[in-house]
Structures are given as C-alpha cells and as structure tokens.
C-alpha cells in the first residue's frame, strides 16, 4: 500500500466522522448513560462477602467473656466500725466486701455541702461510725459511679478523697463525711446508708473480726498539728492462710490472643528477629518471657504530651479498654490513679488480699483519652479448680505495736501506703505452681515501689 492510498483512507474516514459527528455523539452518550445505569444497579444490589471480617469480630468477642463495670473493679481496702470504745474490722473477707459494696451502690446522697476536714475527731466524738477506706484517692466522677449522687441537691466538688465515714446523728439520720486528709477538704451529706445492718453484720460475725488501732501521720499547720493520713492496724498478731496455685500454660495461643486483640490489623503485624516483639506502623507489643509479661505501646501518643484534653477519667477508659481487648483473666481491682500522668494501676486479688508483685500489676497510661501504654502479666492462676488445689497453711502476721515499731525506721513523709498482701513466688522445681505468702508491705518513696515492711538485713528503700 502506497502512501497516497493511506492518505486517501484517512481523508475518507475523517470526512465520514465529520459528516456523522452528531450521530456518533448521540450513540456515545447513550452508551455512557447505559453504563451508568448498569453500575448504579450493581452498587445497589451488591452483597459483599464480610465473612473474614465477621470471623475476626466474633473471635474477639468470644475472647472477652469477663467484662466488668466500674463498680466491679472498685472495692474498699478496709472497713472499720467504731463502737465508741474500740475499732473492729474483717480482713480478707470477700463476701463481706461484696455485701458492703451492694449497700453502697444502693445508698442515696442528698443535701451535700463542702466543709474543711479539720477536727474530724471532735465532730465524731461520742458517735458510732463506720469508715470505708479505699486504696487510693478518687475523684468526684468516680464516686458518682459508686454512690447514688443524682439526688444530692448540693455541691460535690471535692478534688479527691480516699474514705467515707458514715455516722448516726441524734435524730438517727445517717450522715457521711467524704474526706480527703491530703487536700484538707471534705463533703458532708445526708444518706440512706443502712448503718445498723452493717453494724449487725460485724457484731454478729462468729469469726474473722479483728480489733484495730488507728495510726496517724500528722503535719504542722498554723492551727497546730493535724492528721494528714490515717492507717488502721490489727491490735494483736493475727493469722492468714498462705496458698499455692497452678497457673495456666503460656504458649503461642496466649500471645496470639493479645496480638489479635491489641492490633487493629493483626494480619499486617510484623514480628522481630526473636519472635517476641510485634509491631505495625503505629504500635508495638513486647513479650518478656522471663517475667511472663507484655507491654503494648501506642507510638501515636506519648506520656509527656499535654493532658488538657483528657476529658474522661483514665479509670473509665481503662475498664472499657480491658473489656474490649482480651478481658481481665483473674480478679483484678483498681488500686491506684494518677490523674496528672493519666496512669491507672490494678492489682490481682486472691481471697480478698492483693498480690504485691510488680510483675503481676496491670498498668495503663492515657494521654488525652488515647492509650499510650498497656502492661500486664500473662500469668493466670487456676483459682476455681478444687481438683488441683493445695492445702493452705497458717501464717502469723505482726501486731500493730510491731508495725509501728518497724515504721520508725522509715521517713513517714515518703510512706505512701501500707497493706497486707501476698508475696508471690515460684514453687521450687515447679514452674507452673506459685506460692502466695501473706506479709506486711509498704509503698515507699517517690517511685511508689512496694517492699516488705519487715526485713532481716535491708533498710528502707532496699530491693524487693
């Protein structure tokens, strides 16, 4: 074919297109309209396959079978009844604590008003009272979850408080002081608390009731010395049980359970060279096999960022997060809150007593309502299987006089908390068996480290 023929063909096609341009345009327009209708119909009738996504969601829901409410994870550390002559309480009694919690949930507060916390003892002189002590200071929004404050009809602006004292007036009306010794403030309110019912439980208990002594830490003020903190210790030496428990096996399935729950897209998670470090573009999961502990870090949030946007209590965020990310496992209870850093801590409780071991703590850090860090133990004790239970042994613990003598070796301004707790150790030669030994512990120093109160060779601040 010569170039002249090619030219003639192109010229003919061009002329044909020109002469039929309107027809071609109409046909093309009709085609596009038909294509648009077909695509629209396809979108409306599309039935995508979500089976893989639903499988993942179902798996996560199946893993979280032990969700909890705020009131499920908050429990008093002590309940003391003063009968005008002596102080009494019931340590290590789960049933008693549960009954008190139910009473508190049903208690209404009304006609609340702010007062200074000075001269509390004078105000309670010659009165019976019940003191409910919590393990840490709690803010008003947390108390509003424990108590019925909707009908308070007054102000409830106390910054934080760690105890509530219920007492009967001469009119038999039950009032309450919600007290913060450290803030030197309190709220007084009328209540519907069943004072006599709780008093009768303690008076009628056939066993487990101990007599206590108060121990005050004082500070100097312009008006003289005043109580900055108050502890209660059993007056006489007393006995508690030590226990041994099997733990569930920790294997790849255990790691996968947390990996699937913590990462948004587990399929895109990369593992490190050791296989114990997992990461995606925004977070990481570090598994420590020596301590059987995991640490999840969210790189998009840092603990040093501005906290002004923290609009919700870190405790509420923590409970929601654990509920939605592989659950609780053993019974953990709220034990410490630092609102300034957004840090929340939970301790494992066994038969009413906390396990004091850093490797067993559950800790979450929040910045502006976003999680920045989550640490917890992979160890889960088998606490409900009688077939594999071990016989408990009696252990004698020190009296109030001995505790007070030991505290003379400490700077009381650095003593944060005192508690009876379990020391948790491996049984000799049995990696899956843990021994729990009750002891007195002190939370000491600016780093808030727990250590045994009674030691043979080391002084305050020594290693745990």
Predicted regions and their residues:
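Preferential activation on post-signal-peptide N-terminal prodomains/segments
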Residues: 2-17, 26, 38-309
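Hydrophobic H-region at the start of alpha-helical membrane spans
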Residues: 25-33
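Short, non-transmembrane alpha-helical segments in secretory-pathway proteins
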Residues: 96-108, 250-259, 303-341, 386-429
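Amphipathic, soluble alpha/beta structural segments
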Residues: 161-182, 347, 354, 402-438
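Exposed beta-strand-loop-beta-strand "reactive/processing" segments of non-cytosolic proteins
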Residues: 253-297, 328-378, 418-451
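Short helix-loop boundary/capping segments
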Residues: 366-396
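C-terminal structured interaction module
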Residues: 444-464
